[in-house]
Amino acid sequence: LKMGAMFVLLLLFTLASSHREGDIQARKTHLKSDFYRTLPRFARGCTISCGYEDNRCQGECHCPGKTNCYCTSGHHNKGCGCAC
C-alpha cells in the first residue's frame, strides 16, 4: 500500500512539473511574438527616399492611404526602408 501511494504521489508530482514547464514555454513564446509584432515592418508601394546619414536611416517616404510613415532600418531586412 505504501509503495502504491508513493508511486501515485511521484506520478502527480511529475505531471504537475511538466505542466508548469509547458506553461512557462507558452508564456515565453507569447512574449516573443508580442516583441516581434511591435517591431517596424517595411511598407510596400511607397515612394521612398530613405538612406543612411550619420549611421542613421533617414529621409522621407510617402505611402498612399497611410499616415505616420517614416524611414527605418528593418528587423529582418538589411538596409533602410519605409515603415508606417
Swiss-Prot record:
Residues 20-44 form a propeptide. The keyword DNA-binding does not apply. Expressed by the venom duct. It is found in: Secreted. GO terms for cellular component: extracellular region. One of its GO terms (molecular function) is toxin activity. Residues 1-19 form the signal peptide. It comes from the Eukaryota. Keywords: Disulfide bond, Neurotoxin, Secreted, Signal, Toxin. Contains 5 disulfide bonds. The cysteine framework is VIII (C-C-C-C-C-C-C-C-C-C). Belongs to the conotoxin S superfamily. This is Conotoxin Tx8.1.
